Design a protein with these regions (language model features):
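Thiol-/selenol-based redox modules, centered on thioredoxin-like
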Residues: 85-145
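Short pre-active-site segment immediately N-terminal to redox-active cysteine/selenocysteine motifs
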Residues: 1-5
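Hydrophobic pocket-lining residues within nucleotide cofactor-binding pockets
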Residues: 35, 77, 98
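Short, internal strand/loop/helix patches
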Residues: 50-93
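Structural microenvironment flanking redox-active thiols in thiol-disulfide oxidoreductases
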Residues: 6-56, 67-74
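Residue-level signal for beta-strand positions within conserved beta-sheet cores that form or flank
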Residues: 26, 59, 135
């Protein structure tokens, strides 16, 4: 949801892009999922998603358009950004917030515990994820139903 200030915090500070580049360089497939319904805040069609990625210099492996919310509901995504890490064996290894400070202030990024980064490193190192579930924060996903 490009209109969400919590998403803006991480893209505006280049935090999301750094995470995307680090992860994909390590062989991770990073999927950005847009589950907002047409006419709702955060909705983007393919052309708009491409424009947003270019504008923000985003580096996901791919963007999945989910206007019916099927994938979002499958993973119980409630807010944006709501982060998920799926291990190489296909099991859900992490779900929750990108970090520990639920604010829209970019200055808080360096002070926060980087939940997602830690989970990615632990999965890549073949270790259990210490905090496999954390509280996500952000704007609610605007589902069709």
């Amino acid at each position: 949801n490009a209109e969400c200030p919590y998403v803006g915090k991480h893209y505006g500070a280049d935090n999301m892009q750094k995470l995307q580049r680090e992860a994909t360089a390590a062989g991770v497939v990073w999927l950005s999922v847009i589950s907002s319904a047409p006419g709702e805040q955060g909705y983007a069609d393919a052309k708009e998603a491409e424009r947003l990625n270019a504008e923000r210099k985003a580096a996901p492996s791919a963007v999945l358009l989910d206007p019916e919310g099927k994938l979002g509901h499958l993973y119980d995504a409630r807010v944006t950004p709501h982060m998920f890490v799926i291990g190489p064996d296909g099991t859900l290894r992490y779900m929750g917030g990108i970090d520990s400070i639920p604010s829209a202030r970019a200055a808080d990024i360096d002070k926060a515990e980087p939940y997602l980064r830690n989970a990615l490193h632990q999965v890549l190192d073949g270790q259990p994820v210490e905090k496999a579930v954390t509280r996500p924060y952000g704007c609610t996903v605007k589902y069709a139903s």
